[in-house]
Swiss-Prot record:
One of its GO terms (biological process) is regulation of RNA stability. Keywords: RNA-binding, Stress response. PROSITE patterns: SM. One of its GO terms (molecular function) is RNA binding. Homohexamer. InterPro entries: Hfq, LSM_dom_sf, Sm. SUPFAM superfamilies: Sm-like ribonucleoproteins. Coiled coil: none annotated. RNA chaperone that binds small regulatory RNA (sRNAs) and mRNAs to facilitate mRNA translational regulation in response to envelope stress, environmental stress and changes in metabolite concentrations. Also binds with high specificity to tRNAs. The lineage of its organism: Bacteria, Pseudomonadati, Pseudomonadota, Betaproteobacteria, Burkholderiales. GO terms for cellular component: cytosol. The keyword RNA-binding applies. This is RNA-binding protein Hfq. It comes from Acidovorax ebreus (strain TPSY) (Diaphorobacter sp. (strain TPSY)). Residues 10-69 form the Sm domain.
Length: 83
């Protein structure tokens, strides 16, 4: 996975995990899973509800938070310029 993808995914998933935000995860086959993000890595998301499920990221279509989440994707300018 590219580094740019991680710059969006990691802060978003981390905010959902830290704030215990309920989420709906839609899979590419249309199945809807609900719960809270327990953990994640480059390939999987652990989703906790009554049980913990390991969901492979390649099977995920959409993640919908149950409420608004603030997460930072700010990165320093590549050329060191802060304009």
């Amino acid at each position: 996975m590219s580094n740019k993808g991680q710059l969006l995914q990691d802060p978003f998933l981390n905010a959902l995990r830290r704030e215990h935000v309920p989420v709906s995860i839609y899979l590419v086959n249309g199945i809807k899973l609900q719960g809270q993000i327990e953990s994640f890595d480059q390939y999987v998301v652990l989703l906790r509800n009554t049980v913990t499920q390991m969901v492979y990221k390649h099977a995920i279509s959409t993640i919908v938070p149950g409420r608004a989440v603030n997460f930072s994707t700010a990165e320093p300018a590549a050329d060191g310029d802060n304009q």
